[in-house]
């Protein structure tokens, strides 16, 4: 019996595939975030005129989705393999199908459907035209053309492909629980992540200090605005990410009402809009160096 591809090999295969397509292989960004899109390697780089092609694995924390390690498919933290290409290649969909083939999934032998699912992240001022990708009845990826990021129109067109690492691995390894997945060298996903899942869920739902988190949000927000006033875009963006994660912890704990929730999201959105404009202004001051690099390469 042929050994099924483990997660480690799956990630290495995707890295090799997208690296060969011209993507820089970035590393996960070291601030908590709810999705790979929120990494500065996507959020900031999607705006402005400069080209950008990158691929990376991003651990994504969603406190409200924690299930104490007892649910086979819902997790406090999951992993996304993120691909962002700007400008978007005309044959990006073909690239995606070829990437599945590289993982041993022949598109001609499987039911692969692109189901319309336009994307929106209101708290970060983002929207796009998108599709869920279903593989034999299971959603394994999200495919998006960004229209607006940080309240700014995206030009040139930027495409994003997000692979759900655990979901795709579950399909490839044919297991019903993510905790039974082989990460690599015989070590199971549950051996690494089951205990953290339980502890983070307990923290998010039961023991997080709400008063402290409320103070943290206010402090992070104040610092983000201060840094933007000083023209320090990247440190400011880190604090916006911290605001977002702190809000998600408060939301999971039930510490914010429906009305308050809208208010917090509005506060994050205002910062996201500001930092997006500041990033483009900063790159313009530098003469949009990646545009010059593209011209030199051509």
UniProtKB/Swiss-Prot annotation:
Subcellular location: Cytoplasm
A biological-process GO annotation: glycyl-tRNA aminoacylation
Coiled coil: none
Gene Ontology MF annotations: ATP binding; catalytic activity, acting on a protein; glycine-tRNA ligase activity; transferase activity
Tagged with keyword Ligase: yes
Enzyme Commission number(s) from the entry: 6.1.1.14
Reactions catalysed according to its record: tRNA(Gly) + glycine + ATP = glycyl-tRNA(Gly) + AMP + diphosphate
UniProt entry keywords in alphabetical sequence: Aminoacyl-tRNA synthetase, ATP-binding, Cytoplasm, Ligase, Nucleotide-binding, Protein biosynthesis
GO cellular component entries: cytosol
Enzyme class: ligase
Claim: Nucleotide-binding is one of the keywords in the record: yes
InterPro entries: aa-tRNA-synth_II/BPL/LPL, Gly-tRNA-synth_heterodimer, Gly-tRNA_ligase_asu
NCBIfam families: glyQ, PRK09348.1
Subunit-level organization: Tetramer of two alpha and two beta subunits.
Family stated for the protein in its record: Belongs to the class-II aminoacyl-tRNA synthetase family.
This protein's name: Glycine--tRNA ligase alpha subunit
Species assigned in the record: Lacticaseibacillus paracasei (strain ATCC 334 / BCRC 17002 / CCUG 31169 / CIP 107868 / KCTC 3260 / NRRL B-441)
Lineage, opening ranks: Bacteria, Bacillati, Bacillota, Bacilli, Lactobacillales
Record gene name: glyQ
């Amino acid at each position: 019996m042929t050994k099924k591809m483990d997660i480690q090999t799956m990630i290495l295969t995707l890295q090799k595939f997208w690296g060969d397509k011209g993507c820089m292989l970035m590393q996960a960004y070291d601030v908590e975030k709810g999705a790979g899109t929120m990494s500065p390697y996507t959020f900031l780089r999607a705006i402005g005129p400069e080209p950008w092609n990158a691929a990376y694995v991003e651990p994504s924390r969603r406190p409200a989705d924690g299930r104490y390690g007892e649910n086979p498919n819902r997790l406090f933290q999951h992993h996304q393999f993120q691909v962002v290409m700007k400008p978007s290649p005309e044959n990006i969909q073909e690239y995606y199908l070829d990437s599945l083939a590289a993982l041993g999934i022949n598109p001609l032998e499987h039911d692969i459907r692109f189901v319309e699912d336009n994307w929106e992240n209101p708290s970060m001022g983002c929207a796009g035209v998108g599709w869920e990708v279903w593989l034999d009845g299971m959603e394994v990826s999200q495919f998006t053309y960004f229209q607006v990021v940080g309240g700014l129109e995206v030009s040139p067109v930027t495409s994003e492909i997000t692979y759900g690492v655990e979901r795709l691995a579950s399909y490839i390894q044919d297991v019903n629980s993510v905790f039974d997945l082989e990460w690599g060298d015989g070590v199971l996903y549950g051996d690494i992540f089951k205990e953290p899942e339980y502890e983070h869920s307990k923290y998010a739902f039961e023991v997080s200090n709400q008063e402290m988190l409320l103070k943290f949000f206010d402090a992070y927000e104040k610092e983000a605005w201060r840094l933007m006033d000083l023209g320090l875009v990247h440190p400011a963006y880190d604090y916006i990410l911290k605001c977002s994660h702190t809000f998600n912890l408060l939301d999971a704990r039930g510490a914010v009402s429906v009305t308050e929730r809208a208010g917090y999201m509005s506060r994050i959105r205002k910062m996201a809009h500001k930092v997006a404009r500041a990033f483009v202004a900063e790159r313009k001051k530098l003469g949009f160096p990646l545009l010059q690099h593209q011209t030199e390469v051509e």
